[in-house]
A protein has these predicted regions:
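Short, basic-rich loop-to-helix N-cap that marks the start of a DNA-contacting helix
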Residues: 58-71
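A short, Lys/Arg-rich alpha-helix, primarily the initiator
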Residues: 1-35, 67, 78, 82
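Residues within the alpha-helical elements of helix-turn-helix
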Residues: 43, 72
Length: 85
């Protein structure tokens, strides 16, 4: 289990954001429930400045980064269309 309650990812908005790989929406929702940019960076192996840019709607295209985000936050990779291989 990751640092975020798995039920957080079950809502309709989160399912849609994850399916679209919309990390900006994911991070904004996590910020609204009290997670800091520093925490997000630590959990996902990113710098705080990278998290900040994503919060400003910079898109994440790298599969490797998407996998780190999914794994770091405890999101099942399949929810983001990623494999476990």
């Amino acid at each position: 289990m990751g640092p975020v309650d798995p039920e957080f990812f079950d809502g309709e908005e989160m399912r849609a954001a994850l399916a679209a790989r919309d990390i900006g929406t994911l991070y904004r929702r996590l910020r609204r429930v009290g997670r800091s940019q520093r925490q997000l960076a630590q959990w996902t192996g990113q710098s705080q400045s990278e998290v900040s840019e994503i919060l400003k709607d910079r898109k994440v295209h790298s599969v490797w980064v998407l996998e780190r985000i999914a794994d770091g936050l405890g999101i099942p990779r399949a929810r983001m269309g990623l494999s476990y291989g």
